[in-house]
Amino acid sequence: MFKRSCSSSCRTCLVPLVAFTLLVLASVPRVAAQSRISVSVSPATASVRSGGGTQQFIATVSNDRHHRGVRWTLSGAGCSASACGTLSATSSASGTPITYAAPPNAPNPATVDLTATSVSNTLKKASVSITITSNTALSVTISPKRGGLAVMQSLRVTASVLNDVGAAGVTWSASGATCSGASCGSFINVTSTSANYVAPSAAGIYSITATSVADVTRSASNSIGVTDLSGVLTYHNNVSRDGTNTHEFALTTASVNKSTFGKLFSCQTDGAIYAQPLWIPNLSIAGTPHNVIVVATQHESIYAFDADAAPCNTLWDVSLIDSAHGGTTGETSVPSSGTGALVGSGTGDISPEVGITGTPVIDPTTSTLYVVSKSVNSSQQFFQRLHAIDLTTGNERIAPPQSIDSSIAVPGTGAGSVAGLVAFDPRNESQRPGLVLSNGVVYVAWASHEDHDPYHGWVIGFNASTLAPVANAVFNSTPNQVGTLSYSRGGIWMGGGAPAVDSSGNLFFITGNGTFDANTGGSNYGDSVVKLGTASGLSVADYFTPLDQASLDANDTDFGSGAATVLVDQPSGPVAHLLIGGGKQGNLFLLNRDNLGKFSSSTNNVVQAINLGNSIFATPVFWQNNLYVAGVGAPLKQFAFNTATGKFGGAPFSQSATSYGFPGATPSLSSSGSTNAIVWALDNTLYCTPQSRGCGATVLHAYDATNLATELWNSSQAAANRDQAGHAVKFTVPTVANGKVYVGTRGNDSSVLGELEVYGLLPN
């Protein structure tokens, strides 16, 4: 086809290459171009702390058809090998993280290059620059470090990370001895340094941990006690009056000391706080749930405070003598001083005024507070009223309140009787005992002011739904004259205690000095333990009177200066149903509730008598077969109960180093079931009225319940008066709930007339 053309001189042949080339190209098939491999690494830059800091990296390889991933290498101008750091793996699949750990010391220069190289195509790679920060320790702190919380409630927790790398913050977790995962609680509203911890539904001790994102080996934890306590709704915690809160998980024998426990805040009131503060959880007020502490004052006021808020948050407060609460024009609290001796004989036993004295009681099903007020007008007309207060608003739930006056009377010839009737006297009768709520009836008891005659002991039942007096539910302890005695007495005051209630609804209380003839068929029960049946009104079911009753009466040695406690049933013991109480003579009588013993002039028909050696103005605590009580001028004492013999040891099992002056102490006890029990007691010696030896701060004490010689803390220990309380009030009782202890005081008796002190675990 083609001819070769050659030159003879150069032997050169010319070939038409263009045509040949076109022919070759036309004969080669076309192949599609391959996609190129690419590598990227994230994050693109990082700072990692030397000496333990870590950072995850991920290489992404695109178009790697054989899925061979990458190989990782480290290099640096100022380092080599492990001095540049270490890797958790030297190769990885695309998208699989590896962890870089910084070297112990930062190189110089403090930059390391981390390179990911494609295995399929080693020409394809990507690098990131890692800055190694100095080995200044990263540390995590958490706030609060300790605290208390009710089940299902939330607590704001915050973390601070010192020398945090890249402001990475923390992650949150919760743990506990008997839980895992979500059953230990959950977290909401989470940020890099804060969260709301939501407690689980089970009570216990939980730990919240904040873990550094930049260095997972660094973390901080706290301890939160979560309680399922339904409330402190009545005097001494429950109707048995045993004074125990066994649902306390925040306050332990390890956590209560002057380094971690102290005064958190105070709430001022308009008058002295004689009644025990009451605590109720998860109460909705104005659409917001609160744990609430309720306080009553002698200035006729009720306060509802947020039980946890610092500084103090008053949710509402009301006066029980304004028109909205049944008061009339010109009514005031009853002045203790001045002309006319409006309170007793005018000696100022309760000073400077009388308004609300007895501890109220709460019905949690209706959120109702039952409380009795006492007032007077300018005409010296005296008023006592039973109020049913809506705890969500402070308003009267049942209006008007129930007047308690001379329209209530019993047949009798006793002191102050007229025409064969003894009428209730709102002037002379002192509503000192705590109120009782049992089976839909509110029971209220009275004694005297300063033994000012004529007076009697009264117990009256009111329908909780209507406040109307219950038919036949009126008891007078001394309705009839005995011999030629001009007085009756027999007041029910019990050092501010409250009648106890057993599982059958029977009421138990102790009367003070007064006339007695029940042993001869009479109806007078001075200086006696009385058991009232409540099935049909009120009726005496049984009683016990000491053999020396006549001497007790003649010498004002009240049996009823202290109150009774119903003990836990002893089904396998010699006596299944027991009661204990004592008075000014210093004898604690252990009684059979099914057969109290009545009266014998030759012997006391009791299970056991323990001579404390000191007058008793207290309600004993009973916990895990141990009794706790403090007489006047004596230490707090622990007596161990022997379940086999059904009796207490005659000598104290342990006692405190501290002695309590007049009036002794009614303790309270907190525990986590059968462990971490703490006995709390107030030294109210300097209670500021004319009969007191002085005026000064009440002192709160905390003891290990297994050995009272071990004092854990008291409010006078910390420097600079950090934990000092307001002035003492005679007979007051501490309330323990949800990691806090609430104490009513009289403020400083000048610029502050009343104050609630709130103690608890110091948050930091």
Walk through the language-model features, giving the residues of each.
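Proline-enriched interdomain boundary motifs that mark the N-terminal boundary
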Residues: S35-P43, T136-P144
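Short, solvent-exposed loop/linker segments at the N-terminal edge
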Residues: A46-G53, G147-Q153
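Short, well-ordered beta-strand segments
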Residues: R65-S80, V128, G166-S180, A220
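Low-complexity "stalk/linker" and mucin-like segments enriched in Ser/Thr/Pro/Ala/Gly
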Residues: S75-A101, N105-A106, A174-S194
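A short beta-strand micro-motif common to beta-rich folds, especially ectodomain repeats
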Residues: N108-S120, A203-V213
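Short, exposed coil/turn segments at beta-strand boundaries within extracellular/luminal domains
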Residues: V119-A126, V213-A220
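C-terminal edge beta-strand
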Residues: A126-I132, A220-V226
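Mobile, glycine-rich extracellular loop/lid and propeptide segments
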Residues: T227-Q570, A576-K598, F617-F639, A665-S670, ...
